[in-house]
From Swiss-Prot:
InterPro entries: HAP2/GCS1 (IPR040326), HAP2/GCS1_dom (IPR018928). It holds the Pfam family HAP2-GCS1. This is Protein HAPLESS 2-B. HAP2/GCS1 family members mediate membrane fusion between gametes in a broad range of eukaryotes, ranging from algae and higher plants to protozoans and cnidaria, suggesting they are derived from an ancestral gamete fusogen. They function similar to viral fusogens, by inserting part of their extracellular domain into the lipid bilayer of an adjoining cell. It comes from Oryza sativa subsp. japonica (Rice).
């Protein structure tokens, strides 16, 4: 009998083994991949402390089935119809109510944590205005759309002033400088350049840790009763309410293809609407969602040719005026979207746009409005252990009581910050035991994984869970922590409430202009005074440092320097005699004529002045002189002709002296008049050889001397 009983004991597990294998192979061969890894019967015993201080060992028998369940909504139905009871000779006995085990596994998703960083412009634009007298502080009447921007408070946004470039064919914008008259009358031509952002913005999210999400539902049906549990990465071990079923998610088998890792990428999604200051629902327009490497971004806006470039980087680029237009605005979002658009039109897969690159985008059932998940196309096997009975293996685990002491959760900003839940637990039993802790929120918070740990008697331990909001709105949440014993039975449960603040949009250094700022009132007056004081202080500093003059006075200094240089060159050429032929020609053309006209004008003026003052006097003197001369001649005519001639000569000489003094007659030969000497009763006048011409201004008479000749005329 003994050998026979040993033979039956050896065969005791075979009917169950065959039943499970038949169910797996016959019912689900088309599903492909559902494999039964191991089956056994084991004696499961638990040792726990009692009130009387003694350890107690409680055992029960269960069936353990270890399965490899693939992804893709795979199912397994096992029907346990026969069992063999140990120690009996009845053999296999049918079960009145066979056990039917049904396993369903959902699609597998890769879920990525998102952290909001800032907003960036889709396509920054460089605007330029051809103008004159461009200055960074110039108003709209000079630089037009490149005028400095102001925020909603009316304050000037830093680094938004235009950059002024001179004219020329090889400048940033080739332009004509015009002629010299335009420069003098209107000012030197130049161009004003500025950076502006149109109203097309994208959210930028940092992609953090990756986690897998799927769910496995296990149902055990016996007659009219049914037990069901659902396990997943966030809740790996579950016991049914009637304790007849225990399912443990052991882990996943690695596949041949690695899962997409996006830690080095940023996710950009279009922003819906303008303004509001709040993130909106991202929607399902995945054709504009893009994954771009982090090195393509500048979050501080201080680098050119990167997404997120700001005003300061645009103005500070080297060789600004000699660089081509848009030299700082390369590699923007618009460029990458256009690249993928052309690839799709050519029947090629996209490189950056998520649509067409991944499957089942954001179809994760518990996805929030700001979550990112993609489907895993590869078949991923999950190791699942189902406990129904035990026989072949005996093992002992220690079970001890425990409780949750406190839960501390601080408020945090939705999407842009990560919350932290600190759960403090304590082992209140007398044995060292293992525990599991789950943290579950009703909605709005991404699920977190269950944690396993060991505590010694009276030991307190704090476990931390990272909380990430799936919405950008401020909200209140209620979550509960569940402490389980080593046999996965629930020991304690505690609820906690916390709140999140709304996500605040941040454009970084790409600040746009606000047209809604208000001015006026007492605050506007104070702001004006503040701005004036700041301007005066700035001007004072620039006066001592020379900063303003180096920028504003440079054009004037260049004009003065060039003018002085031109004058110096012309003076040197003049000293060398280069312009002498020109001088001679000019004198020949206009010099003699000008001198003649000047002489005639001078003569007319001189004659006119003397004619008014001396005409009457001259006429009187002329008549008187003529009368005297006639009287003298008349007196001496009859008595002595020689004396009459001498008297006439004397009268002429007297007139000659007066005219000489009045008209400034110069004697070329030094005229000398000798005294009258009486010789032979005659008066003789001795004159030196020379020529003296004395003419009366009125033309009435004159004296002319020449080579011992004397002429007198009336």
């Amino acid at each position: 009998m003994a050998p026979r009983r040993r033979r039956r004991a050896a065969r005791s597990s075979r009917p169950l083994l065959l039943a499970l294998l038949a169910a797996a192979v016959n019912n689900f061969a088309p599903a492909g991949g559902v494999e039964v890894l191991a089956k056994s019967r084991l004696e499961s015993c638990a040792r726990g402390g009692s009130d009387d201080g003694r350890d107690r060992l409680t055992c029960d028998s269960k069936i353990v089935v270890d399965l490899a369940v693939p992804s893709g909504s795979a199912s397994l139905v096992a029907r346990v119809a026969e069992v063999e009871e140990n120690g009996t000779e009845a053999g296999e006995m049918p079960i009145r109510d066979p056990l039917i085990i049904t396993i369903n596994k959902s699609e597998v998703y890769a879920l990525y944590d998102l952290t909001y960083l800032r907003d960036v412009a889709y396509k920054p634009e460089e605007k330029f205005v051809k103008t004159r007298k461009c200055e960074p502080e110039a108003g709209a009447n000079v630089v037009k759309s490149c005028e400095r921007l102001r925020d909603e408070k009316g304050s000037i946004i830093e680094h938004t002033e235009p950059v002024c470039c001179p004219c020329g064919p090889h400048r940033r914008v080739p332009s004509s400088c015009g002629n010299i008259l335009d420069k003098v009358a209107k000012g030197k031509a130049n161009t004003a350049h500025c950076l502006r952002f149109p109203d097309d913005w994208f959210h930028v999210f940092d992609i953090g840790r990756r986690s897998l999400w799927f769910s496995i539902r296990v149902q055990v049906k016996k007659g009219s009763s049914e037990s069901e549990v659902i396990v997943g990465p966030e809740n790996r071990t579950v016991v049914s309410e009637d304790s007849s079923l225990r399912v443990n998610l052991v882990g996943d088998f690695a596949g041949y293809t690695s899962l997409p890792s996006l830690e080095n990428f940023y996710l950009v999604t279009p922003r819906k609407g303008v303004g509001g200051g709040q993130l909106e629902v991202l929607g399902d327009d995945f054709s504009r969602w893009m994954l771009l490497e982090r090195v393509l971004f500048t979050l501080d806006g201080l680098e050119c040719n990167k997404i997120g470039v700001g005003y300061e980087a645009f103005r500070s680029q080297p060789n600004f005026c000699s660089s081509p237009l848009d030299s700082c605005l390369g590699d923007q979002l618009s460029k990458f979207w256009e690249i993928d658009k052309n690839r799709v039109n050519n029947s090629q897969p996209p490189q950056y746009v998520v649509l067409g690159k991944f499957e089942r985008i954001n179809q994760y059932p518990n996805a929030g409005v700001h979550t990112f998940s993609v489907g895993i196309p590869e078949v991923l096997n999950t190791n699942l252990m189902i406990e129904l009975s035990a026989d072949d293996i005996e093992y002992v685990y220690q079970r001890s009581s425990g409780k949750i002491i406190s839960i501390n959760i601080s408020s945090f900003e939705a999407l842009s910050q990560v919350g932290s839940a600190r759960v403090k637990t304590k082992n209140i039993g007398r044995l060292e035991a293992s525990y599991s802790l789950t943290f579950d929120c009703l909605s709005g918070i991404n699920p977190v994984e269950e944690q396993y740990f060991i505590m010694k008697p009276d030991e307190k331990l704090i476990r931390t869970f990272d909380l990430r909001s799936s919405t950008d709105q401020a909200s209140n949440y209620t979550c509960q922590a569940i402490l389980k014993a080593s046999d996965f039975s629930e020991l304690d449960r505690k609820e906690s409430q916390f709140s999140t603040t709304a996500t605040v949009l941040n454009n970084g250094t790409q600040i746009g202009s606000s047209e809604n700022h208000t001015k006026g009132g007492i605050w506007g007056f104070f702001e004006a005074i503040k701005a004036w004081c700041a301007k005066m202080w700035h001007m004072l500093i620039n006066f001592f440092t020379g900063t303003t003059c180096s920028t504003r006075c440079w054009s004037f200094l260049k004009f003065v320097i060039h003018g002085l240089l031109l004058v110096a060159v012309l003076w040197l050429l003049h000293r060398k005699g280069l312009f002498d032929p020109l001088y001679y020609w000019w004198d020949g053309v206009v010099g003699s004529e000008a001198q003649e006209r000047a002489r005639r004008r001078h003569k007319r003026a001189h004659s006119h002045r003397h004619s008014h003052h001396h005409d009457a006097h001259k006429r009187h003197k002329t008549e008187l002189a003529g009368h005297r001369r006639h009287h003298v001649l008349h007196i001496h005519d009859d008595d002595d002709p020689v004396a009459a001639a001498a008297a006439a000569e004397h009268v002429i000489l007297r007139r000659h002296g007066r005219h000489e003094a009045a008209l400034g007659v110069q004697h070329r030969d030094g005229l000398k008049l000798n005294k009258h000497r009486r010789h032979g009763g005659k008066a003789v006048a001795l004159l030196p050889p020379g020529e003296i011409i004395v003419r009366d201004g009125g033309g009435c008479g004159g004296v002319e001397h020449g080579d011992r000749r004397h002429h007198a005329w009336h």
